[in-house]
């Protein structure tokens, strides 16, 4: 599960900064353009003083004649700087988000299976999509506004103090109050943003659950149940959005009200004789206009704080994910090939979320080139043993070795390349048939080898009938294929990999009897000179195994070949009678 911890905005931004600083050229250009944009506004206000004191106050002044050209030039500079800053910041933001998304995606692929057992897919998708978009908003729109409005405030303050430091001293009193208000608003925005992330994760998870289980929903008339579930979650999301709206709506007028006290005070002080004597109409107008002009950047800073805090909250969540431990891979052994001699010695294993062990003191030898079958009731621990071979999970105690070396001593990628897995839960990718059969081979196999593997898996007939044959896109998880067709492609994938150790976890469970017999012949050919672990419910498929282990409640309760177990008349013989009606 994701570890919740609260970091300060500054601490989170410091961690985000290395990602942003990689694109400092674009960032630097954007900052310069933003400062120019802000200073152009300040310069426009500063023109009021010569306009009033010289333009209208002097008969021979030609300042009025220059004003139209100055305004046109400033508008051009303002427009150009606005475009450059917007483009550069968007470029920086898109690259930062792409980089973070890639890191999250790659981190997900190296996280232990146990993590995904506890997290919903929808919530994880929300991290890659929604949360990263909030980071984009923080690094583009938010940073643009923060830099521009901050530069505007600094420029206007400088202009005010330059023209009348006496009137401008009012801000020394007002500034801490405004800073305190913005600080409190930021904390509120951060809290609401975290809640919105959680709500969005629930929304995505609920939607994904309904879409994946659409047939079940229709079959059981679950539309009302799912609709009510989604209504509740979407209403929670709406409530969080409204809380953000309320926070933003109250923050702006409160801060502007505080700033308005400064305006009122300036008007009052301007009437004091000692100060009034130092003011010209132009000076007073510039100071008052600059102070009034501060309201816009103050409002902008308050508004953008919500986007920035939302982005920082998303950053914190993403960084928490990136801080989570990857699969433990401390091994150093790498072998091009192995014999496939496997020993399981007194292994006990408990799933992270389970109360009791799934396996208890399991021991057996699987010599190279031999076949061992695991049989037993559902949930007895058969598939768990297969998962331990490839280190999808690590044992609590005991040891599993491959060719005399503990599997923990192998590097994970190297260990797994020695195993070919055909599971009852087939996963296919939204790609061509050929690419699914040769998945992750990176050009290692020729087209002829791919087609040969499909032929051995008795998949060629239905593949060749497709519109584009082996180049046909099969949709998400092979949605356009039947269960048997999907499983035959998975078998072809294992045939092509030709690994020394083969794990067949209910490999023919989705096939009809005729297809099963055909594929069994291919599997028999495939198993020659290989170490094979077969997990099966259909006892007819494992009668020729060198040894059969009967697993019950995580323990091996019987072992022997088919004839020996039938003669023993124990648990295996009972299963055999149930299936064959003997």
Swiss-Prot record:
Keywords: ATP-binding, Cell inner membrane, Cell membrane, Lipid transport, Membrane, Nucleotide-binding, Translocase, Transmembrane, Transmembrane helix, Transport. It is found in: Cell inner membrane. SUPFAM superfamilies: ABC transporter transmembrane region, P-loop containing nucleoside triphosphate hydrolases. Residues 29-310 form the ABC transmembrane type-1 domain. ATP binds at residues 376-383. Its main location: membrane. One of its GO terms (molecular function) is ABC-type oligopeptide transporter activity. Signal peptide: none annotated. Its EC number is 7.5.2.6. It is an enzyme of class 7 (translocase). The keyword Lipid biosynthesis does not apply. InterPro entries: AAA+_ATPase, ABC1_TM_dom, ABC1_TM_sf, ABC_transporter-like_ATP-bd, ABC_transporter-like_CS, ABC_transpr_lipidA, P-loop_NTPase, Type_1_exporter. PROSITE patterns: ABC_TM1F (PS50929), ABC_TRANSPORTER_1 (PS00211), ABC_TRANSPORTER_2 (PS50893), MSBA (PS51239). It comes from the Bacteria. It catalyses: ATP + H2O + lipid A-core oligosaccharideSide 1 = ADP + phosphate + lipid A-core oligosaccharideSide 2. It is a multi-pass membrane protein. Residues 342-578 form the ABC transporter domain. The chain crosses the membrane at residues 16-36, 69-89, 153-173, 250-270, 275-295. NCBIfam families: MsbA_lipidA, PRK11176.1. Homodimer. Involved in lipopolysaccharide (LPS) biosynthesis. Translocates lipid A-core from the inner to the outer leaflet of the inner membrane. Transmembrane domains (TMD) form a pore in the inner membrane and the ATP-binding domain (NBD) is responsible for energy generation. Belongs to the ABC transporter superfamily. Lipid exporter (TC 3.A.1.106) family. In MsbA the ATP-binding domain (NBD) and the transmembrane domain (TMD) are fused. This is ATP-dependent lipid A-core flippase. The gene is msbA.
């Amino acid at each position: 599960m994701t570890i919740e911890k609260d970091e300060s905005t500054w601490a989170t931004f410091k961690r985000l900064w290395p990602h942003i600083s990689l694109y400092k050229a674009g960032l630097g250009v954007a900052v310069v353009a933003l400062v120019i944009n802000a200073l152009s506004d300040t310069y426009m206000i500063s023109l009021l003083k010569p306009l009033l004191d010289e333009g209208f106050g002097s008969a021979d002044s030609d300042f009025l004649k220059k004003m139209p050209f100055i305004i046109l030039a400033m508008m051009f500079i303002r427009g150009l700087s606005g475009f450059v800053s917007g483009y550069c910041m968007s470029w920086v933001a898109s690259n930062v988000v792409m980089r973070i998304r890639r890191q999250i995606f790659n981190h997900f692929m190296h996280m232990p299976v146990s993590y995904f057992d506890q997290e919903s897919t929808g919530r994880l998708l929300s991290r890659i999509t929604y949360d990263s978009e909030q980071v984009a908003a923080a690094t583009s729109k938010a940073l643009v506004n923060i830099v521009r409005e901050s530069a505007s405030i600094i420029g206007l303050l400088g202009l005010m103090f330059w023209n009348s430091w006496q009137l401008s001293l009012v801000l020394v009193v007002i500034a801490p109050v405004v800073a305190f208000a913005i600080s409190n608003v930021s904390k509120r925005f951060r809290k609401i943003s975290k809640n919105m992330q959680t709500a969005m994760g629930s929304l995505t998870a609920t939607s994904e659950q309904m879409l994946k289980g659409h047939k079940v929903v229709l079959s059981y008339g679950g539309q009302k149940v799912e609709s009510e579930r989604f209504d509740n979650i979407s209403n929670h999301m709406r409530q969080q959005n409204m809380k953000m709206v309320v926070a933003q709506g109250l923050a702006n007028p409160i801060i502007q009200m505080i700033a308005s006290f400064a305006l009122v005070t300036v008007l009052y002080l301007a009437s004091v004789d000692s100060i009034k004597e130092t003011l010209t109409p132009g000076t007073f107008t510039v100071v008052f206009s600059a102070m009034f002009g501060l309201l816009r950047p103050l409002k902008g800073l308050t508004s953008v704080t919500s986007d920035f805090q939302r982005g920082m909250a998303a950053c914190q969540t993403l960084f928490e994910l990136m801080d989570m431990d990857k699969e433990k891979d401390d091994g150093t052994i790498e072998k091009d090939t192995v014999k496939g001699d496997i020993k399981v010695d007194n292994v006990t294993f408990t799933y992270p979320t389970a109360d009791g062990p799934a396996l208890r003191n399991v021991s057996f030898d699987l010599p190279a080139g031999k076949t061992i079958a695991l049989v037993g009731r559902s949930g007895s621990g058969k598939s768990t043993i297969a998962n331990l071979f490839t280190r999808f999970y690590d044992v609590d105690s005991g040891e599993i070795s491959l060719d005399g070396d503990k599997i923990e001593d192998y590097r994970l990628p190297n260990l797994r390349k020695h195993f070919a897995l055909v599971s009852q839960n087939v996963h296919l990718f939204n790609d061509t048939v050929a690419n699914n059969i040769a998945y992750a081979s990176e050009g290692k196999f020729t087209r002829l080898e791919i087609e040969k593997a499909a032929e051995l898996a008795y998949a060629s007939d239905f593949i060749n009938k497709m519109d584009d044959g082996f180049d046909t896109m099969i949709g998400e998880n092979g949605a356009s294929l039947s269960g048997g067709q999907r499983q035959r492609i998975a078998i072809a994938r294992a045939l092509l990999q030709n690994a020394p150790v083969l794990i067949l976890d209910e490999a023919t469970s989705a096939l009809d009897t005729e297809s099963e017999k055909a594929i069994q012949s291919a599997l028999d050919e495939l198993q020659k000179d290989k170490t094979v672990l077969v997990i099966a419910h259909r006892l007819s498929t494992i009668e020729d195994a060198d040894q059969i282990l009967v697993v019950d409640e995580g323990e091996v309760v019987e072992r022997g070949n088919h004839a020996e177990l039938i003669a023993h008349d124990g648990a295996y013989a009972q299963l055999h009678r149930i299936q064959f009606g003997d």
